Amino acid sequence: MALTNIRVCWGQTVSGFAGFALAILVGLSPHALAQPVGARETAPAPKPEHSVSLRWIGAFKIPTGTLFEGVEFGGISGLDRAPNGRYWAISDNRESPRMYALRIDLDQRGLHAVHIEQMVTLRGADGQPLPARTADTEAIRLTADGHLLIASEGHWSVNPGWRHPPFVSSFTTSGSFVRAFGLPPAFGLIDNRTTGARSNKVLESLAVTPGGSVFAAVEGALIDDGPVSTPASGSWLRLIKFDPASGAPAAQYAYALPPIPLPRPSEAGGAMASLASNGLSDLLAVSEDSFIAVERAYVPGQGVTVRLVLTRIGALTTDVSPLPSLSGGTFTPMSRQLLLELAVSAHGQRIDNIEAIAWGPVLANGNRSLVLVSDNNFSRRQTTQFLAWEVVSP
């Protein structure tokens, strides 16, 4: 089996964080590797190098056109695993907002099968199914009360009747609406041109920490925070921390999204590169302040690049809630450390439109596993792709 090695050097600030987060990731005591918070934030003296690895387990595909209870399966944009081993997946189909219960047969030997067990229609506060074109559901996470937190990134249209705002709301596992979380005004679709959020670039990811804290992040930069990423320049994204009891926003943090990676850099000036896109497609909690971010880039004619990034809200990370713009502002962003990059193809798989990440089961040897899933866009040229890795300690 192939090994993707991650090298962690204590002589660099962000790498010191990576060692701390990876210690949690593989189930070690974080104190075994971590330095005091102040030391991590202020360039500690070089220390011995540590490493962990991701061991490739396998892949499984569900073809586009697969039907379940007479409805086409696809558009999977979020995934989370329940304590009983069942997975909940959210579809971004705007005509019929729905989620699925899945069973994923995964062990150290391979990713053997994915079984669709249940389809659940999402319902509004009135108890009726969410109407068509009122939600673009992109992320899903289980909360301690057994409910499912779902994020919709909203949609802007010049036709007011076709507009729908982004939201973060809680639902039961039977699809009933429980409550809505509050969003800062700047995250609304105001005019899609001069201020507010960008259509199809708003809430794409959710994370719930082991202690129950809730986070959501935008896929692309808010208009007031500057342009979106290009092959030549990166951008600033905002991550919201919510008070889980009230559902109100409690803080915001800045995440640095780098320039769009080009699988073939020699074509940087080509027409296809000018149509490239990059965004934060999901977020998985590792601890109370550490996350794995999924960055997904697409360049027409070249393919998809996916990066897994370890990121952390440190003691010196700025709460940017008071800042009307991140463009030219003074603040300390979240730390970031590249964990894994999948460019176009890997392990015999052509990398598809990866939009979801979840913890898999703890394997027989005690190691944790990770699962990534792609959104097939209901396209015959794509599939719903499940990819799995084992997190291996030194």
Language-model-detected regions and their locations in the chain:
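Sequence/structural signature of beta-propeller domains
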Residues: 33-394
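Intrinsic disorder/low-complexity signature
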Residues: 2-3, 28, 279
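N-terminal secretory signal peptides that target proteins for export/translocation
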Residues: 1-11
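Bacterial N-terminal signal peptides
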Residues: 15-29
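Intrinsically disordered, low-complexity terminal tails and inter-domain linkers enriched
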Residues: 10-17, 39-42
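Compositionally biased, low-structure terminal segments
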Residues: 9-10, 18-21, 292, 387
